[in-house]
Amino acid sequence: MARPKKRSKTKKILFAVEIIVLLVFIGGLYVYGQLMSRMDKTNTQKLDTQKVQVNEEVQDAINSEDSHLTGYTTYALFGIDSRSANMKFSGNQNSDTMIIASVNNDTKEVKLVSIYRDTLLNLGNDTYSKANAAYAYGGPEQAITMLNTNLDLNITDYATVKFDALATIIDDLGGLDMDMSYAEIVHMNNYCVETAEDTGLSYTPIELPEKPEDQEKVQYSYHLNGVQATSYCRIRYTASLDMGRTERQRKVIQMIVYKAKHAGLSKIFNIMDDVFPMVTTSLGKEDILQLLPTLIGYSIDETAGFPSSYKFSNVKGSIIVPTDLVSNVQELHKFLYGDANYTPSATVTANSEKILEIVGGASNLDDVQTNIGEENTANDTVIFENDGSGWTDTSGSGEQYDTDNSGDTSGGEDNTYVPDDNTGGNDYIDDSTGGDD
């Protein structure tokens, strides 16, 4: 009589396993359905691949599978100002946050590099300006072309986020614990007024501690909500300038990723509901779904800023000049891809030489930025072009820009130069409408 009992026990175990598998399957279908329904909230904007350029040497190496880039996937992340009423993801505003994300496909290691917004680079068609102006010239295609051709990259996908998305996701995650300096507290409180107005979210000003002798020393700890943490990311008038601003942004991104990885499913769904409408990406539903399961295994281990070696040229305020672009690109590829012997392309070499020509040579550069504060006209656009007689700043001409090198400057809003009368200078629609920016 023992055998039938044994078989009965075995059947019960198998039945229990089948129930568990069925529940997991149903749960998987539920999660899949929830994810798919939320994917519709993102703004999918495929890149016009005809407008995205890659340097010839880089493309040849990729085609021959003889490139260190083949083991990695590289994305461009852009942050744009959400304060303008006519703000569009496609262009007409500067991308004041530009981050390169390199993903090692084998180790799942992620590295982030911020491009300093005032870095003088070739935006395309031998027109040189601050890096953050590329997005205003021709949307994500032009911004990615700038990154690819100046830095020898092969970026084919991107995501653009409105700044108020940052405040929203931080609030959804319950805020962030941040160590700050006295100077950062002062500037953060100032930015909070405008950030709260722009996002419609609330905050409580942090009461200033007694002013210390060293105002730049990080020695105070606070729990920041979305408005406060976003304002913290906007600070660029401490001694560390834009380098400190981008470092703060990368720090906040790392903290968000860590908290999101440890959040429950309901909280993740809530974040998707709130934030996805504020995101535009070239990635389709299936692309995003393929990324989501592996995100748990990813870790942001290292971050940096670009250029790593730079000086300042005080043109209409201040611009950051790579010294020189070739060596900076070598360091970039060493950091992102582990290639210590990378030889930059002829395009990078030519751009490097032209950048130094524009600023009058390395001897005209300063080790420090001379103007710090609201009086600094770093928001003013500089557009350097060479008509054969030398480099001149044509930013005051109000002319249109040939984004695709076709000879046509009348092809729609991506080509249109927009003067901003708010600053007394000629700007693209930017963060120059008030506040500390």
Regions found by a protein language model. Give the residues of each.
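Flexible, polar/acidic helix-loop-strand segments at domain edges
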Residues: 66, 70-71, 171-267, 411, ...
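C-terminal solvent-exposed extensions
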Residues: 54-65, 72, 86, 269, ...
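Extracytoplasmic/secreted envelope proteins and their assembly/folding machinery
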Residues: 97, 128, 140-148, 163-167, ...
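Extracytoplasmic
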Residues: 70-73, 93-98, 107-115, 126, ...
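Amphipathic, coiled-coil-like alpha-helical scaffolding segments used for oligomerization/assembly
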Residues: 137-206, 282-284
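Second-shell loop/turn segments in exported
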Residues: 84-90, 128-137, 152-157, 219, ...
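Structured segments of extracytoplasmic/periplasmic soluble domains
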Residues: 78, 84, 118, 145-154, ...
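Entry/capping segment at the start of metal-dependent catalytic domains
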Residues: 2-108
